[in-house]
């Protein structure tokens, strides 16, 4: 069933406003950032994202990059995640956990990022991917479960267990600016296909089919 998001998710071009929201969450204004926003549990594959983000910035000497991780925590996994980040030593300064993000701030954080990582191992739909697309943020996500149906050909789909695919995708999305711009434009257009009206129509059709089948 195709879901949707609130109408407040839009691409924001006001740099001053974006910087204001970044400051609210402690994101340095002199840093570029790669963004991930999700419920922080093991199936979101966050340790994989962090590991490959660090490979990306080290290989390409991108000292001005950080990885911004937003979302609510599952307590047991938070401890595991924190331990992994602490074990990074000096590199841990490149990982910024900002916790829960207020709804009214999400569009600004999406709009201010370089790309969105969502290599989830399993999704029923993948609303954060749709939110990012609506806000003009190019997406790298898994090629599994529902995510290919959401992203279509508007981003890069990877094997969520492949370090090499993730690294290549990040390099493609950052260094190929024409490709990145095409992903932004196509993502915004594709996101318009997902509406709550369409969701209601699909549910209604399914219910009617079930009722007719049951007669």
Predicted regions and their residues:
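Carbohydrate transferase catalytic cores enriched for Leloir-type hexosyltransferases
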Residues: 1-215
């Amino acid at each position: 069933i195709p879901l949707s998001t609130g109408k407040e998710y839009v691409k924001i071009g006001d740099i001053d406003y974006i910087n204001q929201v970044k400051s609210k969450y402690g994101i340095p204004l002199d840093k570029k950032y790669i963004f991930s926003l999700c419920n922080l549990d093991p199936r979101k594959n966050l340790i994989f994202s962090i590991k490959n983000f660090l490979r990306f910035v080290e290989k390409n000497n991108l000292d001005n990059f950080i990885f911004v991780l937003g979302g609510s925590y599952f307590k047991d996994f938070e401890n595991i995640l924190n331990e992994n980040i602490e074990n990074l030593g000096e590199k841990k300064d490149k990982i910024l956990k900002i916790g829960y993000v207020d709804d009214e701030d999400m569009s600004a954080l999406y709009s201010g990022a370089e790309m969105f990582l969502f290599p989830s191992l399993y999704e029923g739909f993948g609303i954060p991917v749709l939110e990012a697309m609506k806000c003009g943020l190019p997406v790298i996500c898994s090629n599994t479960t529902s995510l290919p149906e959401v992203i279509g050909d508007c981003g890069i789909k990877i094997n969520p267990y492949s370090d090499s695919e993730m690294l290549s995708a990040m390099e493609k999305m950052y260094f190929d600016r024409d490709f990145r711009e095409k992903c932004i434009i196509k993502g915004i257009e594709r996101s318009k296909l997902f509406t709550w009206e369409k969701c209601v129509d699909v549910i209604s059709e399914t219910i009617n089919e079930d009722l007719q089948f049951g007669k």
